[in-house]
Amino acid sequence: MDSYLTTPMPYHPVAVMQNLEEKMQYYLVKTYTSLGKLAYNYPVLTMLGLAMSYKLGPRKVLLTVLQGFMTLGIANWLSWE
């Protein structure tokens, strides 16, 4: 039998997907926990943000949030040495 058939794959596709799913769940919980704390500590800003998002519409809000994440990512990338 050929050796490549018996050697285990270091990164099995199922294991990679499970690892990605676990990481996504962790970050989602972390994000929503942070958002919950933010909303609890700053209710006026939360209500203002909700009112603005209702007025602008979900598409505009999503684009603004994505632009903010992109800007933060670029700033973080540029700050690396």
From Swiss-Prot:
InterPro entries, alphabetized: Erythrovirus_X (IPR009629)
Could you tell me which Pfam families the record lists for this protein?
Answer: Erythrovirus_X (PF06795)
What is the name of the protein in this document? Uncharacterized protein X
Q: Which organism is it from?
A: Human parvovirus B19 (strain HV) (HPV B19)
> What is the taxonomic lineage of the source species?
Viruses, Monodnaviria, Shotokuvirae, Cossaviricota, Quintoviricetes
